[in-house]
Design a protein with these regions (language model features):
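An acidic/histidine-cluster motif and surrounding catalytic segment
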Residues: 1-101, 112-156
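Extended, folded domain segments that form the structural surfaces/walls around functional sites
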Residues: 104
Length: 156
């Protein structure tokens, strides 16, 4: 099950179909994996607070992933995205908010499934998987030079 919680009006004001975009991207990233995921569309302040508490980084970011303990199955974990940060990234990178949100949800869910980008080899593998999933969703390659790329700070 994919649960979408929207705690920032910015998301639905800018993208009325935000919940549907999230659900579609999360399902695509899960593929055949069984389990529950919660995706929180939040304000940057909430993301900054979580980033400070769990990663000791006192700043907002685009997406945070919090994998659940194996004993919590079927809950796989939570993904949190900050509206203003994501919207600014999308604009800077010349992407629609819908496409950027799809990418960040796929990225976050892959972290819940154990994917990472701590070194170049892991990053290349994870990015290739993201490209494949996003292509199935009709979203352009987010890592193409003209599209920019998401910030890689490591998984949370």
């Amino acid at each position: 099950m994919i649960e979408v919680e929207i705690d920032s009006d910015g998301w639905t004001e800018a993208l009325p179909e935000a919940a549907a975009v999230v659900e579609r991207a999360a399902r695509a990233a899960l593929g055949t994996v069984e389990g529950d995921v919660v995706v929180l569309l939040a304000a940057d302040e909430a993301v900054q607070d979580l980033n400070q508490r769990f990663r000791d980084k006192d700043r907002p970011t685009n997406v945070l992933s919090f994998p659940a303990a194996e004993s919590a199955f079927p809950h796989l974990g939570d993904v949190v995205l900050g509206y203003a940060y994501c919207a600014a990234e999308a604009e800077t990178q010349g992407k629609t908010l819908s496409d950027h949100l799809s990418h960040l949800v796929v990225h976050g869910v892959l972290h819940l499934l154990g994917r990472d980008h701590e070194d170049d080899a892991e990053a290349e593998e994870m990015e290739a998987e993201e490209r494949e999933i996003l292509a199935e969703l009709g979203v352009s390659d987010p890592y193409a030079a003209e599209n920019g790329a998401i910030e890689h700070e490591g998984a949370a």
